[in-house]
Regions:
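HhH-family (HhH-GPD) DNA N-glycosylase catalytic core used in base-excision repair
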Residues: 3, 7, 12-498
Length: 498
């Protein structure tokens, strides 16, 4: 099936522009819909808070409002010890300018992995260093360095409060090159030492256990996203046990395992991380937030989807821990059932994935990387149960990712990303659209060529599905998940989704 000439419609912003009065009204109501959307600095105390802070409400003329925690810190405010701004959820990019910045933020996460510089990051997007910094400051209100420093400090603050990691381990996990630099910047920015903060929190140092929380906005359909991953996991590298998700992880040279479970009382996911992954905790957290779509805002999504979302208002769009991992899984699932594709995916891990030790017998291998699959002859790939054409497609995708002909990190256009992927022989619009929807994390993505979506909408043409979905902008990806979910409830999923 060919493309249907989808045009890029103007995206609506994630929120209408708010003035100080509206910010203050949201603060007064402690409205959770705005948690992470803005922060309030209290001029009399020089402390900044989340809008849901349980502390006594400050007078309006004492308040200053910021879009980002980093902007509040640059203005001289330090984080509240009660509402803990480091636990606030983030926001998904919607409009075109935000998509460029969103891609840049994904690359900032990668910089933590690969030690890239800001000029190198700017060059990736074909911008001058000066223009790139100016664009980020315009959108975010802070420089890239200021943003990264705040992210590191807030993670350190969370680890000091919630874990029993040593100071050296916390400095490493937060992205600092030395304990001295960590102590110096923390004390400079927050006006107390890391040791003093830990003492005040009543959390002593004793061991390398690392368990922390990642917040979300309610409602959150944990059962739905867990069911989705349970049916599509890489056996040997992932598993779902009851209400928990487990997987092996490799980021750079760091390898280990994680477990994730829902903590509904705290509106967060509880994550346990192997000690060997502490050095890459910042990029790991970013990947987990994308994987579980933790930055979604259910209320505006539900309002836009109307009756479509009534039965499942907290449904999330499953993301990607790794772009190639999702791409490979999509290729393995072409023209066969989900169950059959899951069997083949397990064989791929068993045959080509590197072994790893873990405390869980179900976790014994890594999912192969693009470079590892690219090095495997097509004849070898066929031995896991692939046809020659499918094996060639998988090899072609692996080469394209390895050679950076397909780059999921700096993608700023849904249409361009789909076009790049369809240049690989064997990857058509449906496969490319599905990969882009999960990997790029764009709320308005809609793979209209999908037969399941067409069936749920009672149409026979992709163009008709696209036209009907127009009313759900800018949340069409969530509409797609709701439509697939409706078919699953009716036991009418097409073969490639069942």
């Amino acid at each position: 099936m060919s493309e249907n000439g989808e045009t890029a419609a103007k995206r609506r912003p994630i929120l209408v522009t708010m003035n100080s009065h509206q910010y203050y009204e949201a603060l007064s109501a402690r409205d959770r819909r705005f948690d992470g959307v803005f922060f309030v600095g209290v001029k009399t105390t020089k402390i900044y808070c989340r809008p849901i802070c349980p502390s006594r409400r400050p007078h309006a003329h004492h308040c200053e409002f910021f879009r980002l925690a980093a902007a509040a810190e640059v203005a001289g405010y330090r984080p509240c010890l009660r509402c803990r701004p480091e636990l606030a959820p983030g926001n998904a990019p919607i409009d075109s300018e935000q998509k460029v910045v969103g891609a840049a933020l994904r690359y900032l996460d990668r910089m933590e992995e690969a030690s890239q510089s800001i000029p190198e990051l700017a060059n990736t997007f074909r911008f001058s260093d000066r223009h790139f910094r100016r664009m980020l400051r315009k959108q975010l209100g802070v420089s890239p360095i200021q943003l990264m420093q705040t992210r590191r400090l807030l993670l350190a603050k969370q680890l000091l409060t919630d874990t029993k990691l040593t100071m050296n381990e916390i400095a490493l996990a937060s992205g600092f090159k030395s304990l001295r630099r960590f102590n110096s910047l923390f004390k400079e920015r927050y006006r107390l030492s890391p040791t003093a903060l830990r003492k005040d929190s009543g959390n002593g140092e004793s061991g390398s256990e690392c368990t922390f929380r990642l917040s979300y906005r309610p409602p959150f359909c944990w059962d739905s996203i867990l069911r989705y991953f349970r049916r599509r996991f890489y056996r040997g590298a992932e598993f779902v046990n009851g209400t928990q998700y487990f997987r092996t992880v490799q980021i750079g040279r760091s390898r280990g395992w994680i477990s994730v479970e829902n903590d509904p009382e705290n509106l967060a996911l509880k994550v346990e991380v192997a000690p060997d992954l502490l050095a890459v905790l910042l990029p790991l957290i970013a990947r987990l937030r994308r994987l579980f779509d933790l930055d979604a805002s259910p209320d505006p999504i539900t309002a836009a989807l109307g009756s479509l979302a009534l039965g499942n208002p907290g449904l999330r769009v499953p993301g990607a821990f790794d772009g190639f991992e999702v791409g490979m899984r999509a290729v393995l699932g072409q023209q066969i059932s989900v169950a059959a594709a899951t069997t083949i995916a397990g064989r791929v891990v068993e045959r080509f994935g590197e072994r790893i030790d873990s405390p869980f017998p179900e976790l014994k291998s890594m999912v192969p990387t693009a470079a590892q699959i690219a090095a495997v002859p097509v004849a070898e790939l066929r031995k896991v149960g692939l046809t020659e054409a499918r094996a060639a497609t998988l090899a072609g995708l692996a080469r394209a990712v390895t050679e950076e002909k397909i780059n999921f990190l700096n993608a700023t256009s849904w249409e361009e990303s789909v076009k790049q992927m369809t240049l690989v022989p064997g990857i058509g619009p449906w496969t490319a659209g599905y990969i882009a929807m999960r990997v790029l994390g764009w709320p308005d993505a809609f793979p209209h060529q999908d037969l399941g979506l067409q069936k749920a909408l009672s149409v026979k043409k992709a163009s008709d599905a696209l036209a009907l979905a127009e009313k759900w902008r800018p949340w069409r990806a969530y509409a797609a998940m709701q439509l697939w979910n409706s078919l699953e409830k009716q036991h009418e999923l097409p073969n490639h989704l069942s």
